[in-house]
Amino acid sequence: MATNFLTKIFGSRNDRLLKQYRKTVARINAMEPDYEKLSDEALRGKTQEFKDRIAQGESLDALLPEAFAVVREGSKRIMKMRHFDVQLVGGMALHYGKIAEMRTGEGKTLTATLPVYLNALSGQGVHVVTVNDYLAGRDAQWMGRLYNFLGLTVGINLPQMPREEKQAAYQADITYGTNNEYGFDYLRDNMVYDARERVQRGLNYAIVDEVDSILIDEARTPLIISGQAEDHTALYVAMNKVVPLLVRQEGEADPRTGEGVTKPGDFTLDEKTHQVFLTEQGHENAERILASQGLIPEGASLYDPANITLVHHLYAALRANHLYHRDQHYVVQNGEIVIVDEFTGRLMAGRRWSEGLHQAVEAKEGVNIQAENQTLASITFQNYFRLYNKLSGMTGTADTEAYEFQEIYGLETVVIPPNRPSKRDDQLDRVYKTTREKYEAAIADIRECHERGQPVLVGTTSIENSEIIDELLNKAGLPHQVLNAKQHAREADIVAQAGRPGMITIATNMAGRGTDIVLGGNVEKAIAALEADESLSEAERAARVQELRAQWKLDHEKVTALGGLRIIATERHESRRIDNQLRGRSGRQGDPGSSRFYLSLDDQLMRIFAGDRVKAIMDRLKMPDGEAIEAGIVTRSIESAQRKVEARNFDIRKQLLEYDDVANDQRKVIYQQRNEILDAPDLGVLIDAMRDDCLADVVRQYVPAESVEEQWDLAGLEKALANDWQVSLALQKEVEGSDAITDEEILEKVQQAAREAFLAKVGQVGAENFTQFERMVLLQSFDTNWRDHLSALDYLRQGIHLRGYAQKQPKQEYKREAFELFRQLIDQVKNEVTRLMMTVQVQSSAQLDEATQAMEDRGEGISNVTYSSPTETGEVETVADAATAAQPAAAGVRVGRNDPCPCGSGKKYKQCHGKLA
């Protein structure tokens, strides 16, 4: 109450920001007459003038009014479009690192040119992020004319582009691309074995178009690059033999009394969640059995960090044998396990269960076990976009998620007022008892609109619902178009014409997004086709264009008189924001329009959250079949249900981020170390530090710190140094011939002897030649151990929730154990690198070059690379990299780094698809 009172007096934070921005708008408008007088050359010259002023220390904020005035003037000349005042306000919000909420049709693409130009002047690059390749290409081409006129370069970053083209795109002042491709490029840059193969040049400033879709809807699915992992075939077979030796417990133990178990056993099953859990007795038995088979040392625990993968394999084997049944969950066909869809009963050829379950089922059935794919690199959008020095975004609907943007990304949302007030009539929802009644009412409304010539856009939440409406409209004999967010370029053309008289268009939420629906249809494409037709004379062309414009004017006036575009939806999405996006497709820039949602008690959202309340109202009113309830209380109940779902989804995303932040901190350390290794001209200091650390650990096993001579095992130390590290030292003789020698002096002698042995080795081939070998050894060790670490974190994450039963905080336990695993990773890298450096025998520089090349080939020679990323429709898409696909064994073909790439580009493999590995 007090907050509302204060807001009325002082205005909201949004009002105060807009007031502040409008003062700057007045300054920009005052400059317009002067800039109009400039020649094209003088206007373009402003860009260099601004760059010089930045070089002399002037800030981008100080340049903003002049830079915005230049862009507006350039747009008037090149695009024949003048930025509205509200677009200048939106541009300021974007420049200051905020999210600009601008309604559909308010010209977000043109608004973005203002902050993009201003920030590109710094020379550090600007990334414009779109939801699909079509929009990236369209906007780069469309707005590129303006940037090029003003003297800036524009690049476009697309999937499967050769490395040289990607590097050129990132070197441009402004780069357009999709969120997935930017993320994958970042991951691939941190997998290269040559610094020259990196494509990105730093993450300076990003403007994310449809920011809600990218940073919220797709944030639950990480970007993952996978490849063929280490072969664990023998382990799957061994674990399959352990399972029959474990007995299932019958009955569930009461947590307070421990009663309820009718037959004690080693594991319990939860068939609802398809999970299996070992009992205390089961842990002991499993450890005993695994020790007897030599899989773990005697007396070792199943949950020792070293055995973490064994736990994963044991659980996979138990699930495969007790929860997944032949001819119910899968069938065996041609020696392969084929999954059966539990809902449709169809065979899902080519699909595989993850987390080693598929391999465990293969071991159970005795068929050929196919190698497991391993995560090579992964990152969530939350953590990728937080790497930018400055981030901003724009969308038609951000205000409902303003809290999440602030909480997760530190981004404030500014609601930009429309250029003209909206005339759209958002009608109350109509709720029917059954799905059949709902669809009948929706079809009747569509028919009515079609008969009077009013265009209709039917919005659905899924492809399945689109197909139902499609079938019903076919039966009703109503002509229509269906869009499912699959073919972006074609769908953009169809959506652009969705405002023509009598048009019926069915679209899922994402289909055709980013394209305006103009009342009367979009005539510009037809005009562009005429202007490109060289067979027409100038007079014919002009006459045809005039005809088209006259026809469009008639159509536009007709549709406007009929009430504009009608939006009909057959289901509420679980997010209010998605519903608002659908409504926002109508009533653009002050056009008329209307929207209505047709719902039923059978809809998922209604059934789970709001159904009982609405059903009670219907029963009280004794409503007959076919009658709908249409009341504010119902609409409010539904919106309340949506708020509950949004809150739940926010909690899921926040929890995902809290867990991923642990991996993210570690990822930053590994990637920073990796980049330093790639860029360092000399790696001697790093190698020396690793060797000293490693040998200190070895010495302390035999000569404890601050110990006396009687506690030392010098014979054991001499033997270990000679056998494992090839360091020969007569320590016992030295101690005998010395009056007093300390443990620190022993350590120094060992480290000095190792340093001399190593330098002698380097001296044989020269330090310069040895550096590249050191680089490959370090990179390969970091990469191999990092991949294993990612798998270990996955396994740890899967079972960490069980710590809650032991009255422990799962998140804290995860952080603690993940840190311990990371410490082990660093120790393992030190050991591996030092051992290899000390034991390698170098005869000549040619031999060393050969070894270096072999290591680089092995490091980059990952097979079956795949890229997993979220799609606009909410699914996860996995794309295989053709160049790294596994070859049939009989073929025996291995692509060398300098061989022609198998994709047929004519480039060397290492310069084409080889870099993707």
From Swiss-Prot:
The listed locations are:
Cell inner membrane; Cytoplasm
Q: Cellular component GO terms, alphabetically?
A: cell envelope Sec protein transport complex; cytosol; plasma membrane
Q: Which residues form a coiled coil?
A: none
Q: Which reaction(s) does its UniProt entry say it catalyses?
A: ATP + H2O + cellular proteinSide 1 = ADP + phosphate + cellular proteinSide 2
EC class name: translocase
Q: Binding residues for ATP, per the UniProt record?
A: Q87, G105, E106, G107, K108, T109, D516
Task: Name its co-factor(s).
Answer: Zn(2+)
Q: What is its main location?
A: membrane
UniProt: Zn(2+) binding residues: C901, C903, C912, H913
Instruction: Extract one GO molecular function annotation from the record.
Output: protein-exporting ATPase activity
The record's section on InterPro entries has: Helicase_ATP-bd, Helicase_C-like, P-loop_NTPase, SEC_C_motif, SecA, SecA_CS, SecA_DEAD, SecA_motor_DEAD
SMART domains cross-referenced by the UniProt entry: SecA_DEAD (SM00957), SecA_PP_bind (SM00958)
Return one Gene Ontology term, BP aspect.
protein transport by the Sec complex
Write down how the cofactor binds this protein.
May bind 1 zinc ion per subunit.
Cited function: Part of the Sec protein translocase complex. Interacts with the SecYEG preprotein conducting channel. Has a central role in coupling the hydrolysis of ATP to the transfer of proteins into and across the cell membrane, serving both as a receptor for the preprotein-SecB complex and as an ATP-driven molecular motor driving the stepwise translocation of polypeptide chains across the membrane.
Family statement drawn from the similarity comment of this UniProt entry: Belongs to the SecA family.
Give the protein's recorded name: Protein translocase subunit SecA
- Per the UniProt entry, what species is this protein from, by scientific name? Acidovorax ebreus (strain TPSY) (Diaphorobacter sp. (strain TPSY))
